[in-house]
Amino acid sequence: MARDLEAVIAAADQALRTWKPVWTPFLDGALLEQAQERLAGLAELEIASRGGYPGAERQRLLLQRHDAAIAADEVAIGLMGLELGGNFLFDPAERQDFRSGLLALGAGEGELGDLWLRGDRGAQAILTAAQAAALDGRTAMVRTVEVALEARPLHELQLPAPRLPRRFQTVEASLRLDAVASAGFGLSRNRMAELIRQGRVRLNWQPVSSPSRQLTVGDRVQLEGRGELQLETVTATKRERWRIELVRC
């Protein structure tokens, strides 16, 4: 991550030196927050972010000199959609399986934006226009399934519905990560524990592999494709359980 952050800082320096807008590669949520915090102190730098649709998890930062900044939506970002079509009825795949298939074809991590599943028919993704063009018409192997790749304009994609913040309460026997996250993300506790052990869950953007990890107020739990949970309040009940107020976004 340190190398990726240095690349963002170098892009900011380029924008300031050349007085021209610069788009970074796609950044994940952790790096996006870290980069924004690191660059926030530069008063002469204007920062915006875009990922191809509202609520995108992976986004690119637009870096501009404040004195010469123009509206972010007026700066060409060069994004394209990609259809990943195949029959996954008998061999269901996860998002990471599709991402790994694209990386195996030589796609750059920073060229790949969000990717979402389309049932047993495959997936769709947002990429840089250049990367989508390079993959258009090729095939990839995702698990045991051959997948056809087709570049598409963004408006032809079936984009995920915008995720609006939702506040709710749950009562749990413990503050274990698997218990709270399963309630918050609407998955079974066994499935959540499996995802945690697989490294698919992050706690405050840091990798975590122990389902029994204890949570505290202020903790944030991230799960790719399902957003983030924030622990707002925790109070003990008379029956020695925990009433937890969560915000999912």
Q: Can you name each region flagged by the protein language model?
A:
Residues 190-201:
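Short, basic/aromatic beta-hairpin or loop at an interaction surface
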Residues 1-178, 184, 207, 221, ...:
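Ferredoxin-like alpha/beta domains used as RNA- or RNAP-binding modules
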